[in-house]
Amino acid sequence: MYMKNIFRIILLLTTMLFVSCGDDDEVKLPDTKDVNYANIAGSWRLSEWNGKNLEGDTRYYYITFDRKEKDGKRSYTIYTNLNSATSEQIPGSFLLSKEDDYGDIISGTYYYQLDTDDEWEYSYIVSGLTDTSMIWTAKEDMGEMKVYTRCNEVPADIIAGTRASF
């Protein structure tokens, strides 16, 4: 009888141990979306660049993607003051592709001629695409990383070019 009670207590404690070991402590990552023209369409704000949070910074960088193809290309417009004291509006076209070694890639072309050429400096690996954010990592320089946060629209004063940079 004494052995039966000890056995029952051990069985009860073992059961309690397994019941208390749930998955509650696991970090649940948000569901990621497929990287396609429909899922990245819309307006995005650069919120982090190479580990530096840009929240509250007077500098800004917005990019709006149009998923509809026109003349064989899909367009984007950048609104930024990162390289200038005034607001710049930079149009261009972009392309999504998939590479065996890197996965989903976004690359682009500016619609005006730069000093070197009119292609983006880097092609970017797109990862972690959710309803609210996505991460770009430069394929040619893995230390170059950008985090974009989805926004409803680019602020009107930025589109108009009237936002002060200080």
Task: State what each model feature region is.
Residues 4-12:
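Sec-dependent signal peptide recognition
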Residues 17-20:
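C-terminal motif of bacterial Sec signal peptides marking the signal peptidase cleavage site
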Residues 23, 29, 89-96, 100, ...:
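Edge beta-strand at a domain terminus
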Residues 28-45, 166:
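N-terminal helix-cap/turn-to-beta initiation motif at the start of protein domains
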Residues 46, 96, 124-128:
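A structural signal for short, hydrophobic beta-strand segments that form beta-sheets
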Residues 55-106:
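N-terminal glycine/threonine-rich, aromatic-flanked beta-hairpin/loop signature
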Residues 102-126:
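An anionic, turn-rich surface loop/hairpin at beta-sheet edges
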Residues 128-134:
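Ser/Thr- and Asn-enriched, surface-exposed coil loops between beta-strands
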